């Protein structure tokens, strides 16, 4: 059995509070979704705005493998806009619960909804569109009416139907029961559309598929209004590894797609989010990592490479000998039992103070205890920042790289960005360093607060973390960045 996926990141996902995507950004995400292997891309609502119309039009002209879809109401103008934008299909919804019918069609009854739905489906078919017809708020509706609505949609030649748990009130058991009843009465392919208001979107989607639904709706990273939609990455992995149900998704592209959506939507993925969160394949505890080095399956349900990730071992107050030895082997160092005891004690001391232990911290501790003096390849000699009102921030930097002086300048969106860009220009002949993440905290209060900057840098397949702490956020950022560079050289 292979399940179809309708990705609604560009429609329902964009309804996440604070998210607004440009046409260019929507095209970028659509191309990534197509490369990922989703079957249907709901690219927006053609009638909603000129931007949505243009996005659907642009995406439809890209020659993607996925079916390009527009959201629509049971209104001719919505259908016309979708067809004029070049969409192949529409996901057209009609209110099915009395709550929604009364709110959207005051004074009208269920028969009116059926009549208008049939008219809209027939008109959409005349316009040459594939029609996926959805019952909105179906989980709070009379199920007999929902089935009646679906049967009339089938008679009107709709291509697919969707049961929408619009406010996320179903339990997995109830979803399974409902899907079985619908499949017994209606022969059209059935999709399910779940929201996460009670944290059950993934479970409800899985139970719906188990019961016979052939398609599910979801978003990358679980984006969506309120608590979000079913997260595609979670559903796909759970279906395949727990139930043996396949999709067309290229799983190794899940992480990169997640990071692209995170970057363009500016909605940060929680670190503990399954599959794509920073901590999903990160290990610290000494006992756990010791077992992990012997057999990765001991504390991982799947290999991180399956979803395009790498296993990360971090050190902190729970660090054990195995973790430290792994890092020392990578550095080519060896320690006596007494030295190892001292290294572990110092690492735990930092963790006990509530601080994150970075790779640079660990290396410094190891080299201090082993009395190894390492000459840093990259040193900051001078830094100048120019910024002000109506002035594009610019930075000039002087570095010594292996004893050779390099001077570069660059602009940026802010002074920190300008400084980092200048450093990257200075080292570009030596290495292509990518900034993976940037995090800043104020350690003390007041305008003279000490700030703690932690950066994550990547070179090839190696990722390191480094810290800088100053009262000047620019200097703290530069210090962290250069410390990380020295870890990668």
UniProtKB/Swiss-Prot annotation:
Q: Which reaction does it catalyse?
A: pyruvate + acetyl-CoA + H2O = (3R)-citramalate + CoA + H(+)
Looking at the keywords, is Amino-acid biosynthesis present? yes
Sorted UniProt keywords: Amino-acid biosynthesis, Branched-chain amino acid biosynthesis, Isoleucine biosynthesis, Transferase
| GO biological process terms, semicolon-separated | isoleucine biosynthetic process; L-leucine biosynthetic process
Source species, domain of life: Archaea
Please report which protein family the annotation says this sequence is part of: Belongs to the alpha-IPM synthase/homocitrate synthase family.
Summarize the subunit comment.
Answer: Homodimer.
What is the protein's name according to its record? Putative (R)-citramalate synthase CimA
Q: What organism does the record attribute this protein to?
A: Archaeoglobus fulgidus (strain ATCC 49558 / DSM 4304 / JCM 9628 / NBRC 100126 / VC-16)
